[in-house]
C-alpha cells in the first residue's frame, strides 16, 4: 500500500514538473541563438506592407488576439480548411474581416529561408503583433517565445470564444475570464488595440439606426459623432465601407481610444460598454486612467499582451513547427524516410 501510494505521489509530482517546464520554455531569448534574424524580418515585412496598406498593423494585432482566444496562441487561426476541420477563418468573428494572412505568409517564407524549421507560426504571429504596435507608435516589449503550432483549427470554439462588436460588458468579462484573462485591466487594456485600424459599417448599423430593436440609435452615442457615422454609413448603404476606430489618430497607437470613450465616441458597442455600461464600475476608473496617462495605458497593454500570449501555449514536443502557416506539415511514410533533413527540406 505504502509503495503504491508513493508511486502515485511521485507520478503527480512529475506531472506538475512537466507542466511547469512546459510553461518555462516560453522565453524572450528563445531565438537568440537559433534565429535572431526573425525580429528584423518581421519588422521589415510589416514596413513593406504598410506602404500600400496603412491598416495592416492593426489587422495583424487583431489576428494575434483572435488566435490566442481560441485554444491558446497556437496559430490555429492561420490554417486553411481541410477535410478534417473547418478553418477559424470562417468563424463569425473572422469571416470577411480577419486579414493579414498574406503578410504572415511572406514573413514566414523569409524566416524559413533564413532559419529553416526553427520559428513556429504561433511565435511569428506574436512577434509580428508586437512589431505592428511598435511601428504604429506604441510600446515595445520582449515577446516570450517557444510556442508550437496546432495540428488543427477550431471553428466552433472560435464562434464561442471570440467577443463580438455588440457584446455587452458582462459578456466581454465572461469571455475574457473563460480564457484565463480575469483582471479588469486585461479587458480594458487589450480593448485599447482599437486605437488604430478600421471597422466595417455592417458592425455598427444597429447602433446607428435600430439599437436593441428600438428603431432608434444607441442612446450612449455622442450626437455629433452619430451624425458623422451616419454620413459614412447611411441606411441601406454599402455595409463593407470602412470606418476608423479612432477619428483623431486613426493609424497611430496611442491612448486616444480612451479619450473617445469618455466622450461617448466609441465606434462599436463593445468598446463603449467599458465606460457606459451599468456594470462598468471596475472598468470606468481604468478608462479614465488610460485616457489621462498614455504611459499607464502602455504599461497595462504590455502586461496584458504578455499574459494573453501565455495562454495555453503548446511547447516542447507538442504540436509542430509548420513550414507553411496555412497547412500542417506532411507526415512521411516510414519506408520512405532515409534522411530526415533531406525529406524536411523537400516539403
Curated annotation (Swiss-Prot):
Protein name as catalogued: Peroxidase C2
EC number: 1.11.1.7
Binding site for substrate: 163
Binding site for heme b: 194
Record site feature (Transition state stabilizer), residues: 62
GO molecular function: heme binding; lactoperoxidase activity; metal ion binding
Record-annotated active site: 66 (proton acceptor)
Function: Removal of H(2)O(2), oxidation of toxic reductants, biosynthesis and degradation of lignin, suberization, auxin catabolism, response to environmental stresses such as wounding, pathogen attack and oxidative stress. These functions might be dependent on each isozyme/isoform in each plant tissue.
Amino acid at each position: 500500500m505504502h509503495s503504491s501510494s508513493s508511486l502515485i505521489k511521485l507520478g503527480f509530482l512529475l506531472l506538475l514538473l512537466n507542466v511547469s517546464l512546459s510553461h518555462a520554455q516560453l522565453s524572450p531569448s528563445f531565438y537568440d541563438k537559433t534565429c535572431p534574424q526573425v525580429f528584423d524580418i518581421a519588422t521589415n515585412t510589416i514596413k513593406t506592407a504598410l506602404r500600400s496598406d496603412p491598416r495592416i498593423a492593426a489587422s495583424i494585432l487583431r489576428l494575434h488576439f483572435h488566435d490566442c482566444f481560441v485554444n491558446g496562441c497556437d496559430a490555429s487561426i492561420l490554417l486553411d480548411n481541410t477535410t478534417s476541420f473547418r478553418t477559424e477563418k470562417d468563424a463569425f468573428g473572422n469571416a470577411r474581416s480577419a486579414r493579414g494572412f498574406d503578410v504572415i505568409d511572406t514573413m514566414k517564407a523569409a524566416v524559413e529561408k533564413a532559419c529553416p524549421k526553427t520559428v513556429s507560426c504561433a511565435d511569428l504571429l506574436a512577434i509580428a503583433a508586437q512589431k505592428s504596435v511598435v511601428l504604429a507608435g506604441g510600446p515595445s516589449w520582449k515577446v516570450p517565445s517557444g510556442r508550437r503550432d496546432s495540428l488543427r483549427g477550431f471553428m466552433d470554439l472560435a464562434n464561442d470564444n471570440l467577443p463580438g462588436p455588440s457584446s455587452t460588458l458582462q459578456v466581454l468579462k465572461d469571455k475574457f475570464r473563460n480564457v484565463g484573462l480575469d483582471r479588469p485591466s486585461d479587458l480594458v487594456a487589450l480593448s485599447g488595440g482599437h486605437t488604430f485600424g478600421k471597422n466595417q459599417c455592417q458592425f455598427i448599423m444597429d447602433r446607428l439606426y435600430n439599437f436593441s430593436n428600438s428603431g432608434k440609435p444607441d442612446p450612449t452615442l455622442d450626437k455629433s459623432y452619430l451624425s458623422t457615422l451616419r454620413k459614412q454609413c447611411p441606411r441601406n448603404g454599402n455595409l463593407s465601407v470602412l470606418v476608423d476606430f479612432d477619428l483623431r489618430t486613426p493609424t497611430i497607437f496611442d491612448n486616444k481610444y480612451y479619450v473617445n470613450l469618455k466622450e461617448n465616441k466609441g465606434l462599436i458597442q463593445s468598446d463603449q460598454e467599458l465606460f457606459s455600461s451599468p456594470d462598468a464600475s471596475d472598468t470606468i476608473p481604468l478608462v479614465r486612467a488610460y485616457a489621462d496617462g498614455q504611459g499607464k495605458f502602455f504599461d497595462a497593454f504590455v502586461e496584458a499582451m504578455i499574459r494573453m500570449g501565455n495562454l495555453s501555449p503548446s511547447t516542447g514536443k507538442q504540436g509542430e513547427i509548420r513550414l507553411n502557416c496555412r497547412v500542417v506539415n506532411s507526415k512521411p511514410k516510414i519506408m520512405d524516410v532515409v534522411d530526415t533533413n533531406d525529406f524536411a527540406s523537400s516539403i
